[in-house]
Amino acid sequence: MMDNERKVIPYRIKQARVSRGLSMVELSELVSVSKQAISQYEMGKNAPSKAILNAIATVLKYPVSFFYKPVPANENASSAVFFRSRKTAKVKALNAAREKIEIFREINDYLEQYVDFPMLDLPKITYEDDGINPIDNEQIEKYAMTLREHWGLGNGPIDNLINIVQRNGIMVSKMQLRLNKLDAFSVWFDNKPFIFLSSDKDTNVRIRFDIAHEIGHLLMHADYYSEEDLKNAAIHEKLENEADRFAGAFLLPKESFSKDVFSTSIDHFIQMKAKWKASIGCMIYRCDTLGILSSNQIKYLKDQMTTRVYWRKEPLDKEMPVEKPFAHKQAIVLLLDNKIITPGQLVEETGCSAEELEQYCFLDKGTLETKKDSKIIALKASKKQQKRSV
């Protein structure tokens, strides 16, 4: 269908702008129109000319097809979005993340037309809410062990957490937000859980902790708290505390992890890091939570961390391979290899640039490059074929 036969979807202009963290004034200056014009485009009171739409698409780095794409009927999340660092994150960053969540959900829905992702397999738990007060450690340990048992993980270290999470039907993506103060976040969409990781996190132990933290939110909090609840700083702090403790309990089970803690030497904790694939800081926090070590021993460990400048950059961070999301990558490669879709078709129909699709779906760089045919020589038709065509 030609562009002049299609109608621009006003919401898509707003969605694209907000996802890039821009105000209407900022976008208007970049495309040389008034703020009022942008407002009218977004409200559907006026449609941008083809030239202005092309300028908006270029500035916001979306294919023009994005602005013609119908909005799904079920565009709203079915749970609150659980953001880490909500207190210090700017409203622009939170709103940009929300729009990117919606866009990735649509990419996921598009792929589900062609492939079957793993079915969701999460246990149901009864969350023991205690108002503003965080639930106790015993209950957190119980939730973490319930999930381990449900997934058949035993009590030992978890090898590849992203692999396990995706095989059990949780969608995982990485986002290039280019906005500070946001780590990971999670949400339910139509009974499907999504976890989004910040591309700024580049160490495996931190990525694993973020995933475990978000699983805690999806498992414990999604059915009980609304977006309005999360605006309450005390409630948000409570839920973050619970998700942190869940992550520690899930990654480092009380019984088996405790047996490995027989020294307060940082060098011993480095050895444990290699085994458990958890940061030294996380393990110190876990020892404190479980009461494995005394307050003086915890202080001694923290002092060693400070002396060695390990709080920001720990030993083994570079040596440990980073676990990567793969489900959507596998789906796209499968479709491309079997010529079900082309790279150009994927870009056109999802309304996302090749670069952004590669980021969302963790594709190898260049996977969606459209290679031009370099062949300029063709065989002549045979004389028999020429006669037939006459």
Regions found by a protein language model. Name each.
Residues 1-390:
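Active-site hotspot residues in diverse enzymes, especially metal/ion-binding acidic/histidine motifs
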